[in-house]
């Protein structure tokens, strides 16, 4: 009995006074106290397993950007609850299912899914207007930038673009029976032409297969390179879109450091200069990022001064906890005031509402009508 008490006391002292001792050393300690304890067989990992483990840890580890984005400034402890007007509808319908199946078959990506757009089902099925639309994302699914609002994955060195993607995208879109398509892309700062050639080729191939389809290109800023802007603007599209994302004062808080307000405005001006007559330019901003009404008005005035034809306002929705928080949920009444203000400023069309996104079915329905009206006028003039 005395021997057992002595053994227990020795074990307690060893565990209490040697907290730095690793778990792997416990068997040898037990053997010292009780020689009858069997020794486990050593099984050191192979070099290959170690290399694989390092790769997995590196892939799963949070980046500095993840850490930065997860830090919320201010005293709010809980995210704002969603108001009743932000209810989302469940995607569905035969056309929705058909488009989704074709996307999986050809391994294509849509920003509708990547960005978790709440209007996905409505746009793909055609909704009330009957104008079914979709937004295809080309140049891969990995962006070279890391904006604080965006859910698309990022990397400094994404995989190279698929050379067959322009043909695959054109064939898929031509088979869907859509009337209006939005083609967008991730930023590709790693490519010499920022991906503009790939973009233009996709538009051109689609025009060959389905010349009557209306095409909107929602492009990155191409780092402001005029040659890249010209390449896409003259590719045969009907709408050249580039989003400024937020008001001028919040650009550095919301967007990647390589993007800025002046560069985006210059891209929209260049597009208007290079594109054929009748091509519309378009941009969009999110509300609920911390902007003031005066900042929204000032930014909208500068966008209109750049000759932009179409503008949309929508509510920022936080994709995950590592993204910037929602500052406020802007009311439908406020969105309507911004819409009315934009119309008064001279925009040809303004879409404004909590669920509006830059690529939005209802907006595309009206843009389609505008383009067709312009075509009719041009035909009459001839």
From Swiss-Prot:
What InterPro entries would the database entry show?
Answer: Aldolase_TIM (IPR013785), Elp3/MiaA/NifB-like_rSAM (IPR006638), LIAS_N (IPR031691), Lipoyl_synth (IPR003698), Lipoyl_synth_mt (IPR027527), rSAM (IPR007197)
Against NCBIfam families, the record matches this protein to:
lipA (TIGR00510), PRK05481.1 (NF004019), PRK12928.1 (NF009544)
State the SUPFAM superfamilies in the record.
Radical SAM enzymes
Q: Binding residues for [4Fe-4S] cluster 2, per the UniProt record? A: 143, 147, 150
What is the residue range of the signal peptide feature? Answer: none
Q: Which family does it belong to?
A: Belongs to the radical SAM superfamily. Lipoyl synthase family.
Q: Which cofactor does it need?
A: [4Fe-4S] cluster
- Record's keyword terms, sorted: 4Fe-4S, Iron, Iron-sulfur, Metal-binding, Mitochondrion, S-adenosyl-L-methionine, Transferase, Transit peptide
Pathway(s): Protein modification; protein lipoylation via endogenous pathway; protein N(6)-(lipoyl)lysine from octanoyl-[acyl-carrier-protein]: step 2/2
Catalytic activity of the protein: [[Fe-S] cluster scaffold protein carrying a second [4Fe-4S](2+) cluster] + N(6)-octanoyl-L-lysyl-[protein] + 2 oxidized [2Fe-2S]-[ferredoxin] + 2 S-adenosyl-L-methionine + 4 H(+) = [[Fe-S] cluster scaffold protein] + N(6)-[(R)-dihydrolipoyl]-L-lysyl-[protein] + 4 Fe(3+) + 2 hydrogen sulfide + 2 5'-deoxyadenosine + 2 L-methionine + 2 reduced [2Fe-2S]-[ferredoxin]
Residues that, per the record, bind [4Fe-4S] cluster 1: 112, 117, 123, 359
Compartments, record wording: Mitochondrion
Stretches of Polar residues bias are at: 25-34
Gene name in the database record: LIP1
Taxonomically, the superkingdom here is: Eukaryota
Name this polypeptide is given: Lipoyl synthase, mitochondrial
Residue ranges of region Disordered? 25-46
User: Locate the Radical SAM core domain: which residues?
Assistant: 128-348
Q: Which GO terms describe its molecular function?
A: 4 iron, 4 sulfur cluster binding; lipoate synthase activity; metal ion binding
Which Gene Ontology terms describe the biological processes this protein takes part in? lipoate biosynthetic process
Q: Where is the transit peptide?
A: 1-30
